[in-house]
Curated annotation (Swiss-Prot):
Could be involved in insertion of integral membrane proteins into the membrane. Coiled coil: none annotated. It comes from Ligilactobacillus salivarius (strain UCC118). GO terms for cellular component: plasma membrane. It comes from the Bacteria. Keywords: Cell membrane, Membrane. It holds the Pfam family YidD. Belongs to the UPF0161 family. This is Putative membrane protein insertion efficiency factor. PANTHER family: MEMBRANE PROTEIN INSERTION EFFICIENCY FACTOR-RELATED (PTHR33383:SF1). It is found in: Cell membrane. Its main location: membrane. InterPro entries: Membr_insert_effic_factor_YidD. It is a peripheral membrane protein.
Length: 87
């Protein structure tokens, strides 16, 4: 089962990398956070697994809008859908 999970993780990460390489360059950079939302999603999947990682990535994308300040927001050690405010 872990081999299957590993392959699914790699497949999702591959799709995100394809987005980064082929789709993202067609648009001006707009992400207000570091790391970018797509890199955050990859890190979250690697750290927390596919389900929690995708959930964290989706909520990060929802937070990335013109009404927020942005800044550094790395993937926290513990699963959460909120911004990591560790200083």
């Amino acid at each position: 089962m872990t081999i299957l999970k590993n392959q699914i993780n790699k497949g999702i990460i591959f799709l995100i990398r394809c987005y980064q390489k082929y789709i993202s360059p067609m648009f001006p950079p707009t992400c207000r956070y570091y790391p970018t939302c797509s890199n955050y999603a990859i890190d979250a999947i690697k750290k927390h697994g596919i389900v929690k990682g995708i959930i964290m990535g989706i909520f990060r994308i929802l937070r990335c809008n013109p009404f927020v300040e942005g800044g550094v927001d790395v993937v926290p050690e513990k699963f959460t859908i909120f911004r990591n405010d560790d200083k």
